[in-house]
Amino acid sequence: SSKPFISVNCDQVFEWDTTSLQKKMKDNPKSSYITVYPHTDTQRHSFAHTKDNTDKVWMCTEKTTAGHPTNNATTGFYHFHNGKVFNESVNKLLSKPPEFGEYYVAAVYNELINDGHDVRIDKIHTKTFWPVGTQHDWQHFTHRHYRR
């Protein structure tokens, strides 16, 4: 299908109003979006590097790279503007050896970018997103969330 779609990892909790992001998707139907939040932990995140402090992505990496620091850590919420284009990009990615020994969803955006597609970030607030993929993350979330 050439319809847009969203893929969300299962190891995080989101509590944010998506109205702004939905408007961006509607206003820019040929753009794909990746949500990010400010974090620098290279052991837990992929990163979206943007051009000149804009929302336009020029590269996604599993680690921050020398000479290209960023704190745009991906959240695991991935929007693709076109399912057919997504499939083509995934097939290109899978035809290459995996970076760091495994494939990452964020790397699909590099294939989109290489083929001239528009990829943008949408920043979310740290108080509306909690990673829960490790025991430490889960304990942090439950301690903060259930003490409200």
Residue ranges of model-derived segments:
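Conserved beta-loop-beta/alpha segment of the NTase-like Rossmann-fold superfamily
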Residues: 1-47, 88
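A polyampholytic, Gly/Pro-enriched intrinsically disordered region
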Residues: 1-6, 53-54, 143-146
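Short secondary-structure transition/capping segments
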Residues: 19-20, 132-134
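Short, hinge-like loop/turn segments at secondary-structure boundaries
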Residues: 23-26, 49-55, 138-140
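Anionic-ligand binding region
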Residues: 30-73
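Catalytic-core segments of class I nucleotidyltransferases/pyrophosphorylases
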Residues: 56-130, 136-148
